[in-house]
Amino acid sequence: MPSSVKRFTPYGTEIIIVLLPVVVYLYTTCPTVYLGDSGELTAAAFSLGIPHNSGYPLYALIGKLFCMVPVGPIGFRMNVMSSMFAVLTVWLVYSLIFRITTSKLSSFAGTLFLAFTPVLWSQTVSAEVYTLHVFFVALLMRLLWWWDEDKQFVRIALFVFVTGLSFGNHMQTVMLAPAVIFIVLSGHYRTLLNAKNLCFLSALFLLALSLYLYLPIRTEAGAAIHWGDPNTLDRFLAHVTASAHREGYVLTKSTLEYVSRAKQAALLVFSQFGPLLLVALWGWLKMRPLRWQIFFGAVILFDFAYTVFLNIISFEITAFTLPTCIVLAVLVGNGIADILKRARRASFHSTTMYGALRAACCMIPLIPLVSNFGFCNQSRNYAAYEHLLNIFRTVSSRSILFLDGDDNIFPVTYGRIVEQMREDVTVYDRLNLLFRMPDRYDDYSPKNAERSGYSVEQRIVENSQHDIFYAVFNPDAVSLPVQFTMYPFGILHRPFPTGDLPPEHLGKQAWSRYVTESADDTFYKDFMNRHLSARFHFALGQYLFATGQEALGLEIIKLASQIGYDDTVIHSDIALFLMGEGFLGKAQIELEKALVYNEDLGGVHTNWGYYYFKLGDYEEAVTSYKKAIELSPDSFDYYNNLGLALHQAGKGHEAIVAFRESLAINPDQPKVRGFLKNHNLE
């Protein structure tokens, strides 16, 4: 362990380490609300509400302070919060590398390389919890090294308190536990295991963790957002532990799927550091004391385990491996420091080569800065804001709007709660999490939220005297009352009484009011932005078809397919539409594209089943539907599709079995019951 370093770092280097990322991050940040969780998190901070599990109380409280800064829109202020915590993370990593190596140059190179890696930089442009999380990861590593220098109890006490605060932002902090426990127990465990000290440390940890009392307090106070209503013990624990979906995340995939995910994780890390991984490996081998070599290896190992085995979210939409990247930056710095020492000894009589090597090290951060600038520059990205404007420009006065899908719900949440848009419109989200429907069950549970909502939703559609609109990406999944049929209406959908379509049912006027700059702009779009842009163009293509402009519609739909080139859902939905219009050859091409990017292979098999169904090859359709059911046995839609194919194939008894399986999963399907009755299949 190095002795105390009296001179921490020259001010000039500190200024560069802080100022350069500040300037770059602020220049490239999104100017308003972003897609994904950004709208929900911003609205939660603005209203001191409760976002999705685990509730993120510390994020909401700090975010509220940023919302009060009178600079730009609220969405921009929250994006700046992400940037600022990324800058603090960069400074802490610099501090740690310098403490380990006492080398200003290696600290500079390793730190600024980290600052401009895509995985960190991309999180600075929008309101998300990840830069606050990695700030705590870096802070905890820095505090732990500080404690390990002389084992002062006050330092470990501070570390424990900050650990509790870190849990107040993100539960992934627990993945640091094995590495931290090893350092502590291999260091000075006797003092820590003293009963008095242990009680004091436990009290400090619980004091910091008491941040979570924010959840029931704000729920009782009637916060505008109170996801999960965590004001009872059961709901509080369910929300904090994310039990509603965690059981579906942990060890639910096949061996081959985990191998594939592990490969994706490894490729993601390699894409961030490239050949510098060899320098990081050298830095790890030269890390002293040996205990810290084990510590850094353990952090990477357990972060990898979390990424691969404890989560199923796509790498396209979530910032995985950030703790690993923090560690790798430290190891790169240590590796560069060792290489420079060896080069200096080898060049004792000639400083030219050594000077060239130092100059090369200074240039290292320029590589990610230049190569990733276009990828991370979101300064022209208004996509989420334009989407919520377009939604509200579609709906009529005093209408009812149902929402489904994060990229519909969360931008509207921002617009409604933060900017008070269209307060004449009644908004409901179909899962009843943010915009609650009336007459709900008192015993709310996230597990039964979806199913318990259908009957209430149907009653609203049946009894409303106002226009009904749906902002959904999968209208076929909406179970309408039997006398209604869903039709596209601009970028939204509207239920109309079957066979009773007014002339304006296509939403022609809405298309003339839409904002399309971001959908048409050429700035780099991540997966979520590509999906939204592809959705917009696909809806436009459908509208053109409906108005008799088939050739232009095909051209626009082809563009939608190109924009969503790696989007299984987009290709599948386009294929379904083209099949319905009789373009079976073009539909087959889209289905083949969907197979390449098979995030939802069950859905792809379902669409192949529909393709064969349209061809009249019912046996192949049955085979495809059965494959889909094997992958997603809880999907009642898949059983309905199988039942229809079996019925057409003349296998009435098997069709009845399939429909009964569907009704067992979701009894509230009046159209299915009507089909069974009309075809004597009950």
Regions from the PLM with identified roles:
Residues 44-47, 110-112, 155-169, 181-183:
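Membrane-interface alpha helices of multi-pass inner-membrane proteins
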Residues 269-291:
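Hydrophobic, aromatic-rich transmembrane alpha-helices
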Residues 99-104, 124, 140-158, 163-166, ...:
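Membrane-interface transmembrane helices that cradle and orient dolichyl/undecaprenyl
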Residues 26-28, 48, 60, 71-79, ...:
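Aromatic- and kink-enriched transmembrane "portal" helix at the membrane-lumen/periplasm boundary
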Residues 11-17, 93-116, 135, 294, ...:
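Transmembrane-helix signature of polytopic, membrane-embedded enzymes
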Residues 15-18, 80-101, 136-143, 282, ...:
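Transmembrane-helix motifs of polytopic, lipid-linked glycan transferases
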Residues 389-400, 410-413, 419-682:
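C-terminal luminal/periplasmic domains and tails of membrane-associated envelope-modifying transferases
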Residues 149, 175-206, 364-365:
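Perimembrane helix-loop-helix junctions
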